[in-house]
Amino acid sequence: MSESLVVCDVAEDLVEKLRKFRFRKETHNAAIIMKIDKDERLVVLDEELEGVSPDELKDELPERQPRFIVYSYKYQHDDGRVSYPLCFIFSSPVGCKPEQQMMYAGSKNKLVQTAELTKVFEIRNTEDLTEEWLREKLGFFH
């Protein structure tokens, strides 16, 4: 018997927070970490972080539970230019409960579309989230 894919809606206050985050003027790294409220079947805010490096962000993620992250990253280009790409990172660690993984996987695209993001990455181990990994991923876009 196969379970139908659950697609969770995005909480209204989170939609507004993501919209504001997209147009923020600050020049430091920042992150919005989101989780699924499985009773409400809603993607909700877990925590907001300011001035956080990829390595510090990694330390905030649970090792056995999925999370969605929207990360504003100060990207220093080789030619000296600076940009602030918004990255969507789906943290789906090995060892999560299968039903939890399916709920997050089923809701990922809706959240990406809601947040209007194009730089979408996935990690299967929170330890993979490093500055080097992120710069390598962003290198494909710049």
From Swiss-Prot:
Residues folding into a coiled coil are none
Gene Ontology molecular-function annotations: actin binding; Arp2/3 complex binding; growth factor activity
In the record, which positions carry N-acetylserine?
2
Q: Which UniProt keywords apply?
A: Acetylation, Growth factor, Phosphoprotein
Q: Which residues form the ADF-H domain?
A: 4-139
Q: How is it modified after translation?
A: Phosphorylated; stimulated by phorbol ester.
Pfam families assigned: Cofilin_ADF
Q: Which domain of life is it from?
A: Eukaryota
The entry's function note states: This protein causes differentiation of brain cells, stimulation of neural regeneration, and inhibition of proliferation of tumor cells.
Kindly provide the name given to this protein in its UniProt entry. Answer: Glia maturation factor beta
- Source organism per entry reads Mus musculus (Mouse)
